[in-house]
Amino acid sequence: MSDDAPAVPGLFTLVLHTHLPWLAHHGRWPVGEEWLYQSWSASYLPLLRVLRTLAAEGRSHLLTLGMTPVVTAQLDDPYCLTGMHSWLANWQLRALEAATLRTSSDTTPACTPEALRAFGARELREAEHALDEFATLWRHGGSPLLRELVDARTVELLGGPLAHPFQPLLNPRLREFALREGLADARQRFAHTPRGIWAPECAYAPGMEDDYAAAGVGHFMVDGPSLHGDTALGRPVGDSGVVAFGRDLQVSYRVWSPKSGYPGHAAYRDFYTHDHVTGLKPARVTGRNVPSSAKAPYDPDRADAAVDAHVADFVQVVRRRLIDESERIGRPAHVVAAFDTELFGHWWYEGPEWLARVLRALPEAGVRVGTLTDAVDDGFVGDPVDLPRSSWGSGKDWQVWAGDQVADFVQLNAEVVDTALSTVDKALTQHASVGTPTPRDTVADQILRETLLTVSSDWPFMVSKDSAADYARYRAHLHAHATREIADALGAGRREQAQRLADGWNRADSLFGALDARRLPR
């Protein structure tokens, strides 16, 4: 802490939510595996690098990191690891092409040969470092690296249900199964069972806290409006003892706001402007209304200065918020800023560097930084509260996942889940023998696996936001078809055909290998 920055009351927690849908084996570009590899290279590699560096400096309790089972499965999958290595090698080749470019028909300022050569040289160094780092550290997947950070208490890990379903609309049996299997998946990968979860889409329905308590979950995230904006303390929900933490919108929107958030600053790398020869992003934002054809070349020194300015601004915002909220409630307050992990690096190129600097700067400015578990253990918990049905989507309700635009998804999901549960129940009953354990049924396992992929919250979100909506509809109906196809064969007594179908679908959808239909609540 510097001499001119006295300690402020309370605790600040940064929460990052890491999630992508299952993309392996389901398309390459523009939506599919390319989405995974871009996020991995731009966000996950830099974030782990930042956290490992800060841990080596002796820092701990830095942030709370949500890792959904479906994204962790891809970070550990041999197919994805091989694909990521190839993607990084291709990035290196594209950077080399830019660094040696002599002529170009593109006359935009950021894509002239001179500008691209300078940009390409920097990009080449970055790609070479990323490829070397990946080959050295990631050869066994992401879980060993994350486990090191959890064991060192660098981060707190949040878990979540398998495949990221919108829980309020899910059949209670499948909802319980998805959550318990998701926590078991984390335990298997990290030798650690998370005390808290990031509820998919921060979605909540009254009574879900009891399900959480029964599964051993002690705390979860909601959006600020779910607590009517009073997020200064965690709040037990009803008499469950499970604590809901609300995202502080005033602090979070300082970073993550389409109109005034840091990533839109003129100095930062522009996400949308590409060099069409190499696919690289050589321009800076330049201005909010500046077309891509007029954007200026990226200037790392200018961006670096902007990062420093935004670190200083954020630190002051957090200090002021902690002081104000502590005065308002008459006791030390807790401020939670929560973001998608992919914001840092993928959407906002400079985001990982901003994170590294802000996590150093906050303690120096007299701000205590800790995790959600720290907040519970240290008493940053207020009186019990009843929560409304809510989410962090548009309108803070369920409309993104249950509105008219996606009503067909709601019906599809209900039908597929009913089919899956009835088929699995029948199959397990037929296999059961008095006095002997029921054998594992990989056909029933695959039915549930495909069902969970069908009900992923990503598909209706993408349709509601008109973001790769055709791909989202294709994926939902593909997994629904897989569920029905296997279930129909099994229900008709064609066990061998059902096994062949299950094995075939498993070649594309082999995630959650420990998923066991025998643990489905009866």
Spell out what each predicted region is:
Residues P194-Y204, D340-F344, A468:
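Conserved short loop/turn motifs at secondary-structure junctions
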Residues G159-E181, D185:
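Glycine-rich phosphate-binding "P-loop"
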Residues D4-L63, M67-R125, T231-R522:
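Active-site and substrate-binding clefts of carbohydrate-active enzymes
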Residues A203, M208-V217:
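Hydrophobic, small-residue-rich alpha-helical packing segments that form membrane-like cores
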Residues L101-S143, E148-P168:
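Active-site-proximal, well-structured secondary-structure segments within enzyme catalytic domains
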Residues A5-V8, R52-R59, G141-L158, R187-F190, ...:
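Acidic (Asp/Glu)-rich catalytic clusters
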Residues G218-G229, R368-T371:
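His/Asp/Glu-enriched short active-site or ligand-binding loop at hydrolase and phosphoryl-transfer sites
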Residues R175-A199, V317-A338:
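CE4/NodB-like, metal-dependent polysaccharide N-deacetylase domain
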